[in-house]
């Protein structure tokens, strides 16, 4: 499994941007005995359609096949898809889009006895985020240091 996906990212991002789309995430994983290169793309304002995904999949596949040296010498399956409604929050622009939205945050270590929180993102800066969470019927503001955040994604509020 490649440790550094940066050359792949740098090669395929212009292809994706050239179709007015956004590269949301990129991962290389092994499931059972098969390797997968998963690329998540989106298009604003209304999301990406299946025709664009199919076209990008072909173009990205061609770009990957032409790279020398081959960054993925072992056989793998290329999957290109939408990140869905619960898309990850990774880049700074994702965090900005998430302001006021309902999000899911997973932490490296417990904070106030919990490692997972869901709530509305009220504010953020370089050091921390402010989340409004609901505990039973009470609303509470929680400040979470960004260095403690293991993962974050948009969430659906029920």
From Swiss-Prot:
Keyword Cytoplasm found: yes
Signal peptide: none
Top-level taxon of origin: Bacteria
Keyword presence, Cytoplasm: yes
Pfam family, one: DUF150_C
Location of the protein in the cell: Cytoplasm
GO terms for cellular component: cytosol
Main location: cytoplasm
Keywords: Cytoplasm, Ribosome biogenesis
GO BP annotations, alphabetical order: ribosomal small subunit assembly; translation
Family label: Belongs to the RimP family.
NCBIfam families listed in its UniProt record: PRK00092.1-2
Protein purpose: Required for maturation of 30S ribosomal subunits.
Protein name according to UniProt: Ribosome maturation factor RimP
Gene that encodes the chain: rimP
